[in-house]
Structure formats: C-alpha cells, structure tokens
Amino acid sequence: MAKNNNIVIVFDFDKTIIDVDSDNWVVDELGFTDLFNQLLPTMPWNSLMNRMMKELHDHGKTIEEIKQVLRRIPIHPRVIPAIKSAHALGCELRIVSDANTLFIETIIEHLGIGEFFSEINTNPGLVDEQGRLIVSPYHDFTKSSHGCSRCPPNMCKGLIIDRIQASLTKEGKTSKMIYLGDGAGDYCPSLGLKAEDYMMPRKNFPVWDLISQNPMLVKATVRDWTDGEDMERILMEIINEIMSSEEGEENDKMLSSENCKISVGIVHEPIQVPLNLVK
C-alpha cells in the first residue's frame, strides 16, 4: 500500500457502492414485496426491516438464503476497481450506511473488498439463537433522540461524520474528506464537510436534488456522478488533485527552507576586507 496521503473517503452503500437498495433487494427477491409495501406507511424504515426479517424467519427463510440473495446483488463493474485504486493510493476508506452489518459484510466479503475498509458505520444486524436476523437501530431512538430533524430517527450520518472529523483532529491528522452518496440521508453530512473537502452526490438522486436547491449551503467542492464508470473517473481525478496539491505545498516548504538556509549562509559568511582599507 502507498504511503497514507491524508485522504479519507466515506462511501454510502446502497445505490452508491452497489446499484440497488439492499433492503428492497432481499425483500423483493424472497417474494415479500406486497407485505413490505403494506407495512411501509406504519413505521420507520429501520423498524420495518426488523419486522420483515421476522416475517422471513416465520415463513421458513434462512440466513443462508438471505446471504445467497445478497451475493447476487448488482454492482457496476468499475466500482470495485475504483475502491481498490483509492486504497492502493493510500486513501483511508470507510462506509456510512443505513443498511445493516450482516447485509454489508456479506456483500463486501463476497466481492473481495472487505479488507479495504477501515470502518463500517451501520445498523447492527445480528442473528439470534433461533436463526432470525435482528436489525437494531444505530442510534437507539427508543431511549433518546439524536436531535437532528433532517435524518431518520435511527441514524444521523452528519453526527457520524462529525465524530470521524473529531477523531482525525485528535490524532493530529489534517485529512481531506471525500463523501459519496445518493440518498436524502446523505444531505446532512454534506453540510458538515469543510471547504477543503469534496462531496460526490449521485446525479438526479435525492441528495443531488437537495444540494441543487441551495448549493451555497455546502462548503465542500461538489462533483456529481451518474454511474460506476463516472464515479471511478471523478474519484481518481479528485484524489490526484489533492495529492498534486499536497506535493506542491511540500515542494514550496522545501524551497522556502532552502532559501532560508541560503539566506542565513550569506548573512553569516565572513567578509574579506582588502588590507589597504583596514584602518
């Protein structure tokens, strides 16, 4: 792996790394779409997915059947090379997603990209003793609210980005962040990015629409993308821009340092005075 270049790339998962919503994919592929649509207006999404996992279990669907469905989920062929290239260039990669741990880990392990991510922030998805998947909220809203009116009750991605930024600062890192997402839940974190960061919203998706309503609210440089090929190209361009900028700053520092040494050398060099001028 290349030397760390102080770039942190945060990926949403559904419709960003993969081409579909993993929750909908499992429900549809296992034949529970009608029940899902019936229950959708009655509860938050996270609670609904936990209920759907109970329904799957009650109807005899196993965890292995769920995993088999997840392993055939569609992904654009250029997304995996983009992830591998970014990692090889020294970027730190993280996932922030409103899916769940079992879905994400099953998919990225199957795709062979699990090792490239240093952190996955998502809703816990754990299998109980009866073999049923329990999907819990990332933030337990039954005990307290996370306080963000923009985000669903179980997860504020903006707070997660704030925590990541704070941890990087505590470690003394001056990292630049690149955030990629598609959904309305990715809007809140876009507002927390700094001027030196980059926001990559998927064009004509909810987060792109929200940003387009008032672009001045986002301090970061916004570069939209349409598909995996577009994502790879733009992501590599941004990484190269940041690395070139950092190399230029480093060269400027070295040049400034050399100039300083030369200047000091001239000032302190003994002056040879002709003897006939000595009084």
UniProtKB/Swiss-Prot annotation:
<dbReference type="GO" id="GO:0004427">
    <property type="term" value="F:inorganic diphosphate phosphatase activity"/>
</dbReference>
<feature type="binding site">
    <location>
        <position position="98"/>
    </location>
    <ligand>
        <name>substrate</name>
    </ligand>
</feature>
<keyword id="KW-0460">Magnesium</keyword>
<comment type="function">
    <text>Catalyzes the specific cleavage of pyrophosphate.</text>
</comment>
<keyword id="KW-0479">Metal-binding</keyword>
<feature type="binding site">
    <location>
        <position position="182"/>
    </location>
    <ligand>
        <name>Mg(2+)</name>
    </ligand>
</feature>
<dbReference type="Pfam" id="PF06888">
    <property type="entry name" value="Put_Phosphatase"/>
</dbReference>
<dbReference type="GO" id="GO:0051262">
    <property type="term" value="P:protein tetramerization"/>
</dbReference>
<feature type="binding site">
    <location>
        <position position="12"/>
    </location>
    <ligand>
        <name>Mg(2+)</name>
    </ligand>
</feature>
<dbReference type="GO" id="GO:0052731">
    <property type="term" value="F:phosphocholine phosphatase activity"/>
</dbReference>
<comment type="subunit">
    <text>Tetramer.</text>
</comment>
<dbReference type="InterPro" id="IPR016965">
    <property type="entry name" value="Pase_PHOSPHO-typ"/>
</dbReference>
<dbReference type="InterPro" id="IPR023214">
    <property type="entry name" value="HAD_sf"/>
</dbReference>
<feature type="active site" description="Proton donor">
    <location>
        <position position="14"/>
    </location>
</feature>
<comment type="similarity">
    <text>Belongs to the HAD-like hydrolase superfamily.</text>
</comment>
<dbReference type="GO" id="GO:0046872">
    <property type="term" value="F:metal ion binding"/>
</dbReference>
<feature type="binding site">
    <location>
        <position position="23"/>
    </location>
    <ligand>
        <name>substrate</name>
    </ligand>
</feature>
<protein>
    <recommendedName>
        <fullName>Inorganic pyrophosphatase 2</fullName>
        <ecNumber>3.6.1.1</ecNumber>
    </recommendedName>
</protein>
<feature type="binding site">
    <location>
        <position position="14"/>
    </location>
    <ligand>
        <name>Mg(2+)</name>
    </ligand>
</feature>
<dbReference type="GO" id="GO:0052732">
    <property type="term" value="F:phosphoethanolamine phosphatase activity"/>
</dbReference>
<feature type="active site" description="Nucleophile">
    <location>
        <position position="12"/>
    </location>
</feature>
<keyword id="KW-0378">Hydrolase</keyword>
<dbReference type="InterPro" id="IPR006384">
    <property type="entry name" value="HAD_hydro_PyrdxlP_Pase-like"/>
</dbReference>
<dbReference type="InterPro" id="IPR036412">
    <property type="entry name" value="HAD-like_sf"/>
</dbReference>
